[in-house]
Amino acid sequence: MITITKLNDQEMVINCDLIELIETTPDTTITMTTGRKVIAKEPVESVLSSIVEYKKKLYAK
């Protein structure tokens, strides 16, 4: 699970295993496998870094 910030400054925790696509249009748009789309304030690189850090913690156990 990673935390992102929506455009209205509300934080949201999403399951990164359900992310299908991340686009910059110019905002960062995260499309989930369920079809739901979330627009995040963080740039794509930041979202990807959050996913990598989460996976490192998860598999380090």
Task: Spell out what each predicted region is.
Residues M1-V13, D17-K61:
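Eukaryotic intrinsically disordered, low-complexity regulatory linkers and tails enriched in Ser/Thr/Pro
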